[in-house]
Amino acid sequence: MLVLASASPRRREILSRFIRDFHVVPSNAEERCSGTPEECAVELARLKAREVYSRVGGTVIGADTVVSIDGRVLGKPSDEGEAYRMLKLLSGRVHRVTTGYCIIHEGKEIAGSATTEVKFRELDDELIWAYIRTGEPMDKAGAYGIQGKAGLFVEWIRGDYYNVVGFPMEIIWKLRELGFEVLSR
């Protein structure tokens, strides 16, 4: 039994493109950590995977995505003002999106991370506030979702697009190495 330890509809949708049979069991783990963005993402993924594994067993995938700029981690905005400040900070600059993952398979943990660089165009206040009014940024690390309207903001990316969405292809490859069938319908 393959279990995705996430409430994210984006992670569920990406995984379903490659693997047909899996269950979704959101984690109840508390999301707090310290360290580098990479360490933080992996640690949060581990906490999620372990918490769900303790309840349901099977093969469990935990993932957590963080956006960072100047070494500072940008989580999900708590309100519109914080979303504005995050987007203003990202405007015209390169930032990093890191997804940590932890797969617990037969009691063993396989953990790692993927990082993608993203460059935003210069964003004026009118555009930032129009985007915030869509409601899209409020449940996303760094206050944006590349797969939605904020795709307009992106000048370029270097790395895995799916990582920026929250589920890097590295996870699919790890699952394949563990014997899970991918691309079957």
UniProtKB/Swiss-Prot annotation:
GO biological process: nucleotide metabolic process
Record-given protein name: dTTP/UTP pyrophosphatase
Top-rank taxon, per record: Archaea
Family: Belongs to the Maf family. YhdE subfamily.
Keywords: Cytoplasm, Hydrolase, Nucleotide metabolism
EC category: hydrolase
Gene3D superfamilies: 3.90.950.10
One GO location term (cellular component): cytoplasm
Function: Nucleoside triphosphate pyrophosphatase that hydrolyzes dTTP and UTP. May have a dual role in cell division arrest and in preventing the incorporation of modified nucleotides into cellular nucleic acids.
